């Protein structure tokens, strides 16, 4: 059965003559896309931690080999797997693109700086490249229906802010980010980019200016800046604080993962949060 697929990726025209059997992916969102059509990559840049991958994504994948971190995947580990396709992130892996091409054909797609709509486009491209175009279209249709279901259970137009909190830094995820655009697609009112920054680092005063009805926080560290802000008198001026509408969410699911399953988990989480139900702990 002759297979040839040609798509436009971030580098230009990309063609494969035969269906890839040994795929290595260098971002978590690409693993999510493959899981959506039950194709298992042999290698994933999973930051040496399989738990970075959502449980519902892991359920669709056979065991894989870690090829190191997303920021600096190991070229040796990738080469050792003898892949016939590498899927890389156009922002993170531009510097190693040439080196990766020495190992196998490289499909270069947006991941790190993508929006929700771009992520779904990437998933469609990946589906086509692995010979599962029909299956991916069906999964994307199902995805749209599921997302509409969850959207219908949320109060339309509610102002919601999601951000990640480290020791010294809070980053607001605006409409231009993946998570922000997922929340916006659910009919929620998400802050716009600030001074051209899609993920600005903001202080408590700036958060007060945004003043969301709901504040959703992924704490990257135990001692996170938001926990300190909560001791500040200004904190009580936040609508979300007054209404007790501040919730903690899982950082892997909400900030690192990205993808079809990840968006569905975020939508399900958001419905639970807005209805004051406990979230399932991600194992």
What is each model feature region?
Residues 75-77, 82-88, 105, 207, ...:
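Proline-aspartate-enriched helix->loop->beta-strand connector
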Residues 95, 109-125, 159-180, 222-226:
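Extracytoplasmic ligand-binding site segments that recognize negatively charged/polar headgroups
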Residues 2-4:
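Boundary at the C-terminal end of the N-terminal hydrophobic targeting segment
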Residues 22, 28-77:
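A short, structured surface patch at a secondary-structure boundary
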Residues 22-34, 135-189, 193:
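Basic- and aromatic-lined ligand-binding clefts that recognize polyanionic substrates
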Residues 9-11, 67-76, 195-204:
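Short helix-initiation/N-cap motifs at beta->coil->alpha
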Residues 214-283:
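Structured C-terminal subdomain patch of bacterial secreted/periplasmic proteins
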